């Protein structure tokens, strides 16, 4: 859900870079699951990492060269020329995710990550990748509750080749029966590895389904097993026609390109693709929660207990509380000096990892707080510590020093993103899709500076209520625990 405003809002650990190396295309939520699993295995103690002090300058060099254009078919294009190195990228943001699904077709948005690389009426399955790699490029894709994003990186000399490839798969995607069945099996296997056979993945899925009772954020991005088994070709074709339309997409290109060159190629390759009727709007509003919800998963494959709290955030991405929520999350969880790490990991040694992350999107999402216990850890003690630490923040607020550190971390993340063409493309797409205007990206430093300690405390008081949360535990089954104790 949350692909935030600032490029570092969802702190991405080093382990996740494996995704690009091995070409794993997975929903965003499962990348966090992977990172937690790696943290437990390797002794890493946080999803987040400290950053250097941010520069005070707010003007991004080169931003004055950004040019945008909307084609007659509704495709929005943003170009940020950056000639430091002879590379460019091609980021396509489709406004479709699991929030656009319903029982019977859950997981379709993610399924298209696979289909989009498996042939067109002009090209065989796998040819997209072969041509791109022969041109010196690489690619990836990701699906969240709100969007599906396709990312290409390549030498700028290959720009027209990329335009041809991308236009072809939008205009002429193949729906071959054998490919559909093959990829259905791949996705089902992916679900087993990231959810069904992953205790934390199962916990996250069931907590989302418990926290959201009306809004489609309750559906897992990967899809439910029975739906994965039963999608029809007609389902796929209708979904693609509805959501993979130029008027439902934003294209961002950053790097060693000229806007006139980009727009000429867009007119040649993308403008002929017909717009489609606007997708049905999601108007459902999740009812206010009036009592704590709890669930317990007992799993024989759970190595250690894990607890998570999921609080309704009360704000969509780009809402007025977004900067304050980002700073609250940072104070709670970013770095070894953060409140949760210091209390549960360093001081009390009640957890091997403790942290938080935010999932917001077009609609209000969740603030997640979690702790992973050591083998044999005291679950009641760990939950009580989390409650106590959150209650302190609500009651006493945050210090000026914490605010300064949090602002510096967010600003430093902002400027790191602005230092690369991929960071620029991601941020422009995030702001255009979630905020409605990419120019608001450059207001981010001032937005963080404007948040006060009182703002953060007021937001904490608003959302960190037991009646506003779902609590979930995943623990080893008693039989599994007994076996471990008998065979240490």
Where are these regions (language model features)?
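N-terminal secretory signal peptides that target proteins for export/translocation
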Residues: 1-31
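Sec-dependent signal peptide recognition
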Residues: 32-39
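Proteolytic maturation boundary segments
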Residues: 41-78, 258-298, 306, 443-488
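Histidine-acidic residue clusters that define the catalytic metal-binding segment
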Residues: 53-67, 168, 190, 194, ...
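M16 family metallopeptidases and their MPP-like homologs
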Residues: 80, 85-103, 107-111, 125-170, ...
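Active-site His/Glu-centered metal-binding helix of metallohydrolases
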Residues: 108-116, 328
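Short, polar/flexible loop-turn hinges at active-site or ligand-entry regions and domain interfaces
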Residues: 118-123, 170-178, 398-399
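His/Glu-based metal-binding/catalytic segments typifying zinc-dependent metallopeptidases
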Residues: 192, 209, 278-337
